[in-house]
């Protein structure tokens, strides 16, 4: 659409071209089949959304009725019990990254809006403060969309096809770009944009890390002054620090503070904890102190070489705290860790041999997990490319400066290295899976996939049974915990889920692949279940809440597994309900799967209450649960997902708006600065350069993203000339 040289009105297309999104993107002719020939040949998802409105140019009018939020849907939310979440988990997530709102190295918003109106002052809603045109009901206590009863739900409509789950609306919500999603309903589009803008506001401006930088001069606090009282330390961490605290070095104190920051995630509320009522600002202060301590060492030791400072990967204020796990593997290969010392260096001490084996297993495991998250092949050949043997089954106390190690313990004896050994035993299988799945121009035959899946599944089940069979050999001997068992199963079984997914998706049209669907349901259920113990002991595990806290606050693996496994269960359960092949034998398993979905929705709701960006997943899975509920209650083939999506979006907006008003960034800034005992008006860069005697040149700007996109986002420590650069870029 354009305006010609004569000034005539823009010409609109009378009829939009009917083509799937992939054909439109590739600018090729679409045969309008489902799926079309090009998408089927390229193994792409064929989606027809030619009715998508041009949201950037369309004028959104308020809905005609503001009271239709609840009346539009009769979906009742059951008072199903919530997950046992403790009230002391307001500190959400610990990561070694930019330490912003989510405190995670791995979280970066998938896409930031190109409108500078979103980046407003943190203490005001600005453009988001306008009253919404829909009525927002306060969130209910439960998420029982998956009603256990067989009462018919009011799901009549023409929006979502129950019998065509491949293009179901909830899958569109889950896999779309959250900043460009479309709805047929103009009201839903407006609700989505408002809620998404509020989520981005909380994610991008909730905890600007520039506020927490201070000078390395005499005003920097001592590490010992940040150590909390002993009652608090004993709850967060068990260390022999109090025997001689004055003799501890700053390096040890920084490590101690960071370890206690991790402990705040798992520490339960107790009267003896003293100051554990709200440890979030204190934990933030500890992490920022460790970050700045390391930064001061780097800067001062480098004589303030500004060239190095400008290109440092730990640039101030940005999310550039990134270290590739592939670099660790290649570094290990340069050190020769991938070659077994007994073969290539027989004269090496036994202790050093054991340490090198353990280090290689650790670095390789990090690379495998990162490759799976990034959907990339492993930087190793399929045959492994290494001959390092497995670590010996020895405890740390058995290692010493001796030429030869003692005989390793039998496999039935649990030691410090047992978990590493079990992980290492499946590494070669997982390397083959990753290279077959993600290597270019490589397709994995179905029989080969079944063989790998069977091999990995047997290994996972064998490891699970082994950990559950350990018995104390001596009084006080080490025993695997439920948490360790779950982490081991999580790190290995998630590869099985990735291997089965391509074939399970095709099982709806090819019944010869039915086994992969059942196997994926089983793997997803185990990934979302905790604890994994099959014993008859009654009562919850004493550490039963640890993994739940990681599901709520964790990023990376924990976030990805929660999303992928829940989506797989929703998709496969919907397809099984559509086929209704085994109505008698599947009734009880389907009820258990519905409970797993309810638990996942509860976790996403709690993540959102802790300002974790998960609106897209929450809305998608609530809509999926509504579709499952309609199928279980034998509704018609069509249902209207509009009331469910509208209700879920209203709950998201209510939660996010409450978070923004109650937990403003100014509040966190004041609390954290108070813990650090720092002047809030301090200019980090001027003090830093004046301390070192350097000229006050421009620091590396934390507004690199906004400069690149022509946005204005000034920060408290920006020098006047750096603000001029921002204005010029605009």
UniProtKB/Swiss-Prot annotation:
Example of a GO biological process term: regulation of transcription by RNA polymerase II
Residue ranges of the DNA-binding region? 20-46
The domain of life is Eukaryota
UniProt keyword list: DNA-binding, Metal-binding, Nucleus, Transcription, Transcription regulation, Zinc
InterPro entries reported for this sequence: Fungal_TF_Env_Response (IPR051430), Zn2-C6_fun-type_DNA-bd_sf (IPR036864), Zn2Cys6_DnaBD (IPR001138)
GO CC annotations? nucleus
Q: Has keyword Membrane? A: no
Named from the GO MF annotations, one term is: zinc ion binding
Its subcellular locations are: Nucleus
Role played = Transcription factor involved in regulation of gene cluster that mediates the biosynthesis of aspyridones.
Protein name, as recorded:
Aspyridones cluster regulator apdR
Q: Which organism is it from?
A: Emericella nidulans (strain FGSC A4 / ATCC 38163 / CBS 112.46 / NRRL 194 / M139)
Chain's gene name: apdR
